[in-house]
Amino acid sequence: MLSRLGALLQEAVGAREPSIDLLQAFVEHWKGITHYYIESTDESTPAKKTDIPWRLKQMLDILVYEEQQQAAAGEAGPCLEYLLQHKILETLCTLGKAEYPPGMRQQVFQFFSKVLAQVQHPLLHYLSVHRPVQKLLRLGGTASGSVTEKEEVQFTTVLCSKIQQDPELLAYILEGKKIVGRKKACGEPTALPKDTTSHGDKDCSHDGAPARPQLDGESCGAQALNSHMPAETEELDGGTTESNLITSLLGLCQSKKSRVALKAQENLLLLVSMASPAAATYLVQSSACCPAIVRHLCQLYRSMPVFLDPADIATLEGISWRLPSAPSDEASFPGKEALAAFLGWFDYCDHLITEAHTVVADALAKAVAENFFVETLQPQLLHVSEQSILTSTALLTAMLRQLRSPALLREAVAFLLGTDRQPEAPGDNPHTLYAHLIGHCDHLSDEISITTLRLFEELLQKPHEGIIHSLVLRNLEGRPYVAWGSPEPESYEDTLDLEEDPYFTDSFLDSGFQTPAKPRLAPATSYDGKTAVTEIVNSFLCLVPEEAKTSAFLEETGYDTYVHDAYGLFQECSSRVASWGWPLTPTPLDPHEPERPFFEGHFLRVLFDRMSRILDQPYSLNLQVTSVLSRLALFPHPHIHEYLLDPYISLAPGCRSLFSVLVRVIGDLMQRIQRVPQFPGKLLLVRKQLTGQAPGEQLDHQTLLQGVVVLEEFCKELAAIAFVKFPPHDPRQNVSPAPEGQV
């Protein structure tokens, strides 16, 4: 009974409520907006204080409600047809450009965004929609730093979302005007796909349109308003600007408002990561997307000071594009904000390449390589000015540390090292930049040498097989460093004693210092004939004579600590190279192959030369040289094992290895310490100074003493690396648990 009564009441209310003519209401609201421009004489009243925002809101609500009431999905209702036929969006775009009344541009952006987002019917294929959309994008692009940035980024967010849903829209939004122009030139109809005859775009004729109320004083499009609009409302098409969605997004990415910039960057990322190959190809071939992104990177680079301290650059390493501002707790220095902006944008470029479609990623990586690496950065790296070399090298190191995308890493490696994979020769002409960087490792300026060595150390940690191949492995192929006809040593007893080593001089034997005692080990060998790991480890540990060792007098400087660290680093390195398919054992020597002279390569040569001068170089430089050599020794390739970490290989005539270089240094040391009075005491004091346990007073022979400390620690580090590596581990297998204790 109650339900029947409720139904009767509902029918009564419905009968008394007048039916709403949506089209009539829609036209009345539009007429109210146009009449404001015809009748109003006050040009100072803000738009938000007029009835324009309310009328636009009513028009939007009518469009949404009409669509919800449509019986057949996908059909345009009378109000939407009216919007399309009478080019309301184009008129609004013109009003927004005039910025009359003040704040009208903001209202137009909001209306466009809400219509495109809330109306489900596909709109962007229509000429009367995507043409004003393009105009509005160009309008936003001309207002850098304007008060409408928030509305502009919301507008681009809607567009990027629509493009992601339908990648075909990209062509219409980016270059719809040009498409229409080409069609007109060819005599083709201007109706774009999905236009229908019932609501196609027309100039002024309303043939085929549903009957509608006559709007008093109305004429076609914006013509009724022309006599009442300021002079600056001429058509945007007349300009020569090429602004579009890409340039608008890039402009918003540079906003001072962090939220606006971040949202614009996210929108651009959404655009380039579309899965459609056709859209990706169009983005690369028919838009200025990649050049514009790289152009901004180059501009940010040029905006930095000519000289930046590498230590200052290091404080900002790791800046993310999501948080590009410099940390407030860091010390300020000239150019800090410019540096933070550059590193943040480079990180964004790297992230774009990582997430983008392969077609876009490759094109953007090549653009970065050609326009930034080669044209902008390389001249600074090759400059004669030490300040330019220092700053550009430190910046390149910071960029490498941030670099994650495989495509950009591939381009960076080719830029730095070239593409030649043949073994090097002493007199060849290597890749220009590579040759300069190698020369910088042995520069007269110790600071440049240290900075360049840091660059190579960072490069060695990147997951690209071409790096270690170009620097080291291509010269070790075929094992030409091994003496022909020399059998592998079967035990320690078969190896050359230090006393018989030709690198030692008679003065060393007569110096009164004892040579390293031979370890009392069983002549055990590993399963493949290699010298037992214990013998190799002790060879490095016993290399520095007891008279030149001081670590035993201090805590936490033992070999165990190095083993623990080496295990973690080796595990990380093995994981990085696991997919490179390296062999587990050295390549067998081929007796039928002609013997070729061995050259360790330009990179190892400069490292060995630096290592041979360890007793005469600054402490910080020695630390960096040994750090790079340790990184090399960690690689789980059998030829690197053999050449850098096996003291018992029979070297070919004229060849040197890391161990033989160390033996020469020890020979030189044993001669020089005779001339240093109170050598053991001074050496211990220097070690305490380096560890902060003693005041840093200046001593005689301080460089020599610091070099001895580094030498001892480096030998322990090599012993630890050998311990965790030998017998060679399969880089495709997990390494065993970290060993404890000392060998």
UniProtKB/Swiss-Prot annotation:
Positions in coiled-coil regions: none
Q: From which domain of life does this come?
A: Eukaryota
Region annotation Disordered: where it falls in the sequence? 186-219
Tissue specificity, in the record's words, reads:
Expressed in liver.
SS bond partners: none
Bias (Basic and acidic residues) ranges: 196-206
Family the entry assigns: Belongs to the FHIP family.
Q: What protein name is recorded for this chain?
A: FHF complex subunit HOOK-interacting protein 2B
The record lists the organism as Homo sapiens
